[in-house]
């Protein structure tokens, strides 16, 4: 049962950003690069109008409204990515065994984690750069999902199972997501 006559969500296009929409594929080009994403859902229309991206659906149900707002958030994140970019900061924590973290190609290699002989590896997604500076790992890129997934891959690579995590707190932990500090 429709809730309203229509749902209309708008996203402002800032100066220096170009948005093109062809067959449900939204392309955003800005000073830091270009992103492309397919946003498709039955009955939901996406178009540009007066310097704005408009997401529109007639006679929406609850799910249609949720989809329209999700598309709005995706487009806003794409615009923010090509203008400012996204940065995640991770902290390397160890007590007894000094671990070394380095970038090799499209992987982050963690050596001597809890004294292990075999290095642990975390995948770096395309379009993401990882820098290791002492005990800090910085993950940067224009695609929010790729940057977040790369940071999560690094954090998951040092996950400890079957040991008491209150005692063995070694690992690499996300301390700042997209400029916002994490509360523990």
From Swiss-Prot:
SUPFAM superfamilies: Ribosomal protein L6
Keywords: Ribonucleoprotein, Ribosomal protein, RNA-binding, rRNA-binding
Domain of life: Archaea
Gene Ontology MF term list: rRNA binding; structural constituent of ribosome
Any one Gene Ontology BP term: cytoplasmic translation
UniProt GO cellular component terms: cytosolic large ribosomal subunit
Pfam families in alphabetical order: Ribosomal_L6
Assembly and oligomerization: Part of the 50S ribosomal subunit.
Protein family (similarity comment): Belongs to the universal ribosomal protein uL6 family.
Role summary: This protein binds to the 23S rRNA, and is important in its secondary structure. It is located near the subunit interface in the base of the L7/L12 stalk, and near the tRNA binding site of the peptidyltransferase center.
Protein name stated in the entry: Large ribosomal subunit protein uL6
Organism encoding this protein: Thermococcus onnurineus (strain NA1)
